[in-house]
Design a protein with these regions (language model features):
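Catalytic-loop motifs flanking and including active-site residues across diverse enzymes
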Residues: 26, 123, 213-216
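Short helix-coil-helix linker/hinge
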Residues: 20-27
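N-terminal accessory segment detector
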Residues: 2-14, 20, 42, 46, ...
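Pre-recognition alpha-helix immediately N-terminal to the DNA-recognition helix
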Residues: 28-32
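C-terminal non-catalytic interaction appendages of large macromolecular assemblies
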Residues: 209-255
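Short capping segments at the starts of secondary-structure elements
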Residues: 25, 36-40
Length: 255
């Protein structure tokens, strides 16, 4: 028997729609696929392994909820291409409630008193650790928040020389107590952070955790290149690494 999927939460700015909580396993499977890319009806049927009638019912329900929509295929107007029409804001997984060290009192005392960790940073880490323990995933919100922060601080760091801009960013990062940042510029910009403010004290989960950082870099470099960029965290303290590494890749000209 397969494990239950985490409940997913979507929001839509339309006042008549608001927030939708999705629990249906079939709907969750469909939405996971559509978060990766737009898909035709037959593709969705094939990938879910469900009957056409079952998929059709779920797609109709998701459309009526304002979570997805569709467009007519540009070549064959008999076909529909489905896409997500709302914002994915997080998920809740109640299947694992194991207590983790980072939320226990002795761990907090050790880092506040014995190690003299930055209190505001420890508060942030404790909150994130508690969310992880309770199975609450707000990574999309953190990334969106980071994106807004990156765009708001861009003008303070900007220089038309990329090397100077990166040095300004590294100085800002250290001055604000966010960690130590180094970089390597190529077709893909590689950013390495040490003593990461976002994740250094978080539990080892085997997955990257720096979605606020990812969003900040996304916002900064989208503004710098005036292009959409893809930012991927390839190494992280929560993956057992001794640093966090981000790869920034400009994608294409804005339409």
């Amino acid at each position: 028997m397969s494990e239950p999927k985490p409940i997913q939460i979507f929001s839509n700015t339309n006042v008549n729609i608001g927030v939708n909580v999705i629990k249906s396993p079939v709907k969750l499977t469909i939405l996971e696929m559509l978060r990766d890319r737009d898909m035709e009806f037959d593709e969705i049927v094939s990938n879910t392994g469900k009957s056409k009638s079952t998929v059709s019912v779920h797609l109709k329900s998701l459309r009526e909820s304002g979570i997805i929509s569709y467009k007519v295929h540009p070549v064959d107007n008999r076909k529909k291409i489905f896409y997500i029409n709302s914002k994915y804001i997080g998920s809740v997984d109640g299947s694992d409630n194991t207590q983790i060290q980072e939320t226990q009192a002795d761990y907090l005392v050790k880092n506040i008193v014995d190690e003299d960790a930055e209190f505001s940073t420890l508060l942030f880490h404790t909150l994130k650790a508690m969310l992880i323990q309770e199975g609450i995933n707000i990574d999309p919100i953190l990334q969106s928040t980071g994106n807004s922060i990156g765009k708001s601080i861009f003008n303070k760091l900007y220089d038309d020389d990329l090397d100077v801009f990166m040095n300004n960013l590294a100085e800002f990062w250290q001055r604000k107590g966010l960690g130590r940042l180094t970089f390597n510029i190529g077709q893909i910009i590689k950013i390495t952070t040490y003593d990461c403010f976002e994740c250094e004290l978080l539990p080892k989960t085997g997955k990257p955790a720096c979605f606020l950082d990812t969003g900040i870099f996304e916002g900064l470099f989208t503004e710098f290149f005036n292009l959409p960029v893809k930012v991927i965290e390839t190494q992280c303290y929560t993956m057992g690494d001794e640093k966090c590494v981000f790869e920034v890749e400009p994608l294409g000209i804005k339409s």
